[in-house]
From Swiss-Prot:
Sequence motif 'KMSKS' region, location on chain: 619-623
Any one Gene Ontology BP term: leucyl-tRNA aminoacylation
Leading EC class: ligase
Reaction(s) the record says it catalyses: tRNA(Leu) + L-leucine + ATP = L-leucyl-tRNA(Leu) + AMP + diphosphate
GN (gene name): leuS
Chief location bin: cytoplasm
Taxonomy, superkingdom: Bacteria
Protein biosynthesis listed as a keyword: yes
InterPro entries per UniProt: aa-tRNA-synth_I_CS, aa-tRNA-synth_Ia, Leu-tRNA-ligase, Leu_tRNA-synth_edit, M/V/L/I-tRNA-synth_anticd-bd, Methionyl/Leucyl_tRNA_Synth, Rossmann-like_a/b/a_fold, tRNAsynth_Ia_anticodon-bd
CDD domains named in the record: Anticodon_Ia_Leu_BEm, LeuRS_core
Its EC number(s): 6.1.1.4
UniProt name for this protein: Leucine--tRNA ligase
Amino acid sequence: MQEQYRPEEIESKVQLHWDENRTFEVTEDESKEKYYCLSMLPYPSGRLHMGHVRNYTIGDVIARYQRMLGKNVLQPIGWDAFGLPAEGAAVKNNTAPAPWTYDNIAYMKNQLKMLGFGYDWSRELATCTPEYYRWEQKFFTELYKKGLVYKKTSAVNWCPNDQTVLANEQVIDGCCWRCDTKVERKEIPQWFIKITAYADELLNDLDKLDHWPDTVKTMQRNWIGRSEGVEISFDVNNYADKLTVYTTRPDTFMGCTYLAVAAGHPLAQQAAANNPALAAFIDECRNTKVAEADMATMEKKGVDTGFKAIHPLTGEEIPVWAANFVLMEYGTGAVMAVPGHDQRDYEFASKYGLNIKPVILAADGSEPDLSAQALTEKGVLFNSGEFSGLDYEAGFNAIADKLAAMGVGERKINYRLRDWGVSRQRYWGAPIPMVTLEDGTVLPTPEDQLPVILPEDVVMDGITSPIKADPEWAKTTVNGQPALRETDTFDTFMESSWYYARYTCPQYQEGMLDSKAANYWLPVDIYIGGIEHAIMHLLYFRFFHKLMRDAGMVNSDEPAKQLLCQGMVLADAFYYVGENGERNWVSPVDAIVERDEKGRIVKAKDAAGHELVYTGMSKMSKSKNNGIDPQVMVERYGADTVRLFMMFASPADMTLEWQESGVEGANRFLKRVWKLVYEHTTKGDVAALNVAALSEDQKALRRDIHKTIAKVTDDIGRRQTFNTAIAAIMELMNKLAKAPQEDEQDRALMQEALLAVVRMLNPFTPHASFTLWRELNGEGDIDNAPWPVADESAMVEDSTLVVVQVNGKVRGKITVAVDATEEQVRERAGQEHLVAKYLDGKTVRKVIYVPGKLLNLVVG
C-alpha cells in the first residue's frame, strides 16, 4: 500500500467501484429486516452548501451503519425541482426554468457523488417531470371526486402595473419587486384541499410519534390549534344578520364591552357606505398583508362602524368596531372583546377609550388592578350577576349552558388550522388538473388527458406565466365540449408531500404507488431535515400519508417513525463599512485574522487592507457572504475529512461551528489511522489471535478495544451521538499508536483492533475505510462487512482498583483481583509502603470494606 494518505487518489476510485457494482441499489427482500433512511430532498439551486452536506452526511452515516447490521437499507435521493427561484434565475440568465433546473441537477448530482453518499441512484426522481407529477394530478382529481378539494376566493398580492400575482417574497416594503408599484390585496378564486377534515387525526396521532422531537410536535399542536369554546350569536340593531363570535373564555362573557369585525366583514362593508373614515380604513387593511405571526406585534387600529350589538345576557348595547387584528379567513371574521381579561382587547380599548369591565377576581380574591394591563389568569367570577362566585370551570359551563338554553350559544370545537390553499399563479409548477366548460361547469381533467404537461420550451418575461400568456395552451375539449384548462399550478409543497413514497417504486406505471413495495419500505425509519420545516412540509407530509392510506395505497398511519432535525452550520462573519456607509461582507476565507491566547479573533483585515468588523459566528448565508463551498474543502482535504469533521464537531441536532482548524484536525487523524495501518501491514503476515495466551497488558488493550466497540455501537445505534462515537475511536487510536509490536500476539491484537477501527469509521469515512479494509485483508468488501461485535468476555475486568484509607484519609490505591477476599485485600494493602507507614506501631481497631472499591482501616 502507498505510505501517504492521498484522498484525491483513492476517493474517485472507490466511487467508481460503487457505481460499477451498483453497491447501494436495493430491492424488496422479505427475508431481511428493512431500514429506510431518508434525508429531505434538495432544491436544485445550483450548488450544494454546507447545510446540505451536514444533512446528507448524517443520513449516510446512519444508512451505512444499519447496512453493516445486516439490514436491507434504502437510501434514495431526488430533486424538489419546481419553484419560484428557477423563474427568477431564468429571467436573469435569459433562459427557461427547465434547462436551468436540469443543468443544476446534473452539477449537484456530481457534487453528491464526490462526497461519497451511498444512494440508490436507480430511484432518483425529479419532481418537475411529467412522469412524477402525473400521479399527483390524478390523485388530486380523485380527492376532488371525494369532496376533499374545493374552490373559493382568497386574497393574493396583486401588482396593478404588471397585472400579475406576486409571491410574498416578491413584495418588498409593500411594493412590487420589479416595478416598485404599490401592491394591492385582491380576491381571486383558488383551489383548496380539506386538511381540516383530518385535523383531529393529525393532532391525536402526534402521540404515536415517540421518536419525533417534542419541539416539532408542540409546533404542530399549536399550529392545528384545537380549542373548546362557545359560538355566540348577537343581534345587531339595524343589521339584518346576526353577528357570530367564537370564544374559549365564556367565563368572562359578562365583561364583553365591544365586538370587533374584520375589515372585509359584510357588516363593515355595509357601514362603510356612509362612513368615509371606515371606507378608507377598509381600503388600508385590504392592501396590507398581515402574516399571522406579525399580529401580536403590529399596531392595533380600528374604526367604529356605528352599529350596536345587544349583549344577550345583560341586554346592554355594545359598539361594533372594525379592527385590523381580526382576519376574515379565521373563524367567523368577528370576535368578542373582553378588555379586562385579554391584553390585546385591553390595548385597543385603552387606545380608543372603550369601556373596560373587570369580571374575574385576582388570585388573592381582590378586585383586579386594571390600571396598566389586563388580568388574563383564570379565577373566580364577580360582577357577573347570577354567575358571580363561580370558579373558572363552573362559570364556563354555567354561561355556556345558559346561552344554549336561550338558543344563542353552542359549544364548539375550533381549529386554528386552515384548509391548504394549493393554487399558485406561477409558471414553474405542476398544472392543476381542472377544466371549466363554456357554461361555467368545473370538472376534473379526464384521466385519458393526464398528465396535463407543463410546456418547458418557453420564454420568460418576468411578469406573466407563459401558460397564462398563451391563450392556446388552455384550450381543450372534454366530452366533445370546448373547455379551458386551469392555468394556476400547484404549491410546490404538493410534490414534497409524497416523494418519499414514490421512491419505493419510482418506475411503477400502473398508478401512484405499488402498494406491495410501498408497504415493504414504509414507514420511513428515520427522516432527517431542518426544523424550519416543522409545520408546513412536515404537516403536509403527514396529511398526504393519511390521504394515501385512505385511498388504499399504504397501510400505515404515519410516514416516518423517527425525525432527526439537524442543527444549522455557522461560520465567522466579517464586514467593512464602504464609502457610503454600507456594509460589505467579506468571506471568512478572505479574512486575515489575529487571535488572542484563547484563540478568539481580536483583529481582522482583507487582502485589500480593509479593517474588518467581526460579528461572530452566524448561520452560513449569501447575505453575509460567509458560506464555505463544500467543493473547495473536498478538493483541499478529501470527502472523508469533511464528513468526519461534520460529524465530530457537534452533536447532530445542535448548531455546528465551521472551523477550518477543526477540518485540519480531522485530516491529521485520518493520516494517523492510515500511517498505523501502513506500518502494521508492511511487517508482513499476522498470526491468529490466541486470547488464552495474552499477557496482562495485552488483555488490558483488548479490553479497551472491545469497550470502544460497545460504546461506539451504543453511541451510533441507540443514542445517535455521533461525535462521542468518533471521540471514542480517537481515544482508542491513541492507545494503539503506543501499543508495543514486539511479539506475534501484539501484532495479532493490532490486526483485530485495526479491522474494528476501520469498520467503525466506515459510516463516517467510507473511502478510506474501503481502501484500508482491503489492505488489512478484510473479508470481501467493507460495504458488505458486518459491524464489529464487542466480545463480552474481553470486557470483563479481572482486576479492580481499591482506594485505601487510614482513619478516613486516602493513603493509597491498590490493584487486586476482582474476586479477592477482604483478607487478601487487607494483606495487599499492608504491602503498599505508603499505607504501611501509617500503620506502623498502631493497632487496627476496625475495618470498613466496600468490596472492590474501598478499604478503610481505623487505627489507634
